[in-house]
UniProtKB/Swiss-Prot annotation:
GO cellular component: cytoplasmic side of plasma membrane
Keyword Cell membrane: yes
Family membership: Belongs to the Syd family.
Subcellular location: Cell inner membrane
Topological relation to the membrane, as annotated: Peripheral membrane protein
Protein name per UniProt: Protein Syd
Keyword Iron-sulfur recorded: no
Length: 181
């Protein structure tokens, strides 16, 4: 596993939870994840859950994605999706406001791998270099992804070659994120 990415993700998650504690005097709250089982859930309200990050359980890899395409996935992507279970977190990188995607449970991890495979299928069909998404943006046609060839983090427009490099590595990207509440 890519230790730098794992440490950077854990550090950002701590910054996010600390900012939430400071502003709301509680763990993060999510309405979107209400009713979805997870080891992260601390307590529930009538329409939301309070969550706390938990260590990832299971095989710490995205081998299902590798097997589907007979490719080697950047070790940083393995680390990103298998360091922890947590809720999605809102963040800012430079001028970009984003939702950092996380796996909520073992079931969610399987779903994420299926979505990554679907993303790669589309890219292969369009003859685009392979990327693996890690965050969404307000514009649904754009995502933040890791280029599987270079390891760079890019803002990309789905289905096109439009990509802007944001950081040389996933660890560098995560280190520069600022929590948004």
């Amino acid at each position: 596993m890519d230790e730098l990415t794992s440490q950077a993700l854990t550090a950002f998650t701590t910054r996010y939870c600390d900012a939430w504690h400071e502003k709301h005097n509680s763990w993060p709250l999510s309405e979107e994840l209400y009713g979805v089982p997870s080891p992260c859930i601390i307590s529930s309200t009538s329409d939301a859950v309070y969550w706390q990050p938990q260590p990832f359980e299971g095989e710490a890899n995205v081998n299902a994605v590798e097997s589907a395409f007979d490719i080697v996935i950047q070790s940083a992507v393995h680390a990103f999706y298998t360091t922890q279970f947590a809720g999605d977190m809102y963040a800012q990188f430079a001028d970009e406001k984003l939702t950092l995607l996380q796996t909520w449970s073992a079931d969610d991890f399987r779903r994420v791998q299926e979505n990554l495979i679907g993303h790669l299928v589309t890219q292969k069909r369009l003859k685009l270099p392979p990327t693996l998404f890690i965050a969404t943006l307000e514009n649904e046609l754009e995502v933040i992804s890791v280029c599987n060839l270079s390891g760079e983090v890019c803002k990309e427009t789905l289905g096109t070659r439009n990509r802007t490099v944001l950081a040389a590595s996933l660890a560098e990207f995560l280190t520069q994120l600022k929590p948004l509440l």
